[in-house]
């Protein structure tokens, strides 16, 4: 009798497995939809609109040709020195932002778009090349090309752009944005504000803008 019960359970398990395999596409779509429903509903955003993600208020300052939204922290999230050099790739700020990446992913899933950060120096040198981040800080070019859409704050904040590089005037100075919106440079071990940004993927197709 006990053996018959075991055989009956195994048969039910086999039947269940067969049903799952027969409907695996439906199951995959169901699981995907269930996961997506756990993520934050993000409304359509215009330039200047804000949304709170990972307990930070983000303001849209740019939209690219694919309709992706560039979201900049509306205020300072931390204060830190830039590191031991002006190379963003080795900055402790960059490493700290990896924690923020995970918090953002928990709320919006795969809607965060990789950022190619161009570390072309202010004096025209490319020693540092580029790097890829999911959350980063603005470069000089990204700031100046969108300055009119970027809210000024009371603190000066770091840019990822070096003032020069080892093949030029050295690796000591980093560009920053002052509280008046002007751009200057500071020694890498100064304590400056960190104002990160990320790119929010468009899920509605290519923008008509």
Labelled PLM ranges:
Residues 1-6:
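Short, Lys/Arg-enriched N-terminal segments with co-localized hydrophobic residues
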Residues 8-209:
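Collagenous Gly-X-Y triple-helix signature in extracellular proteins
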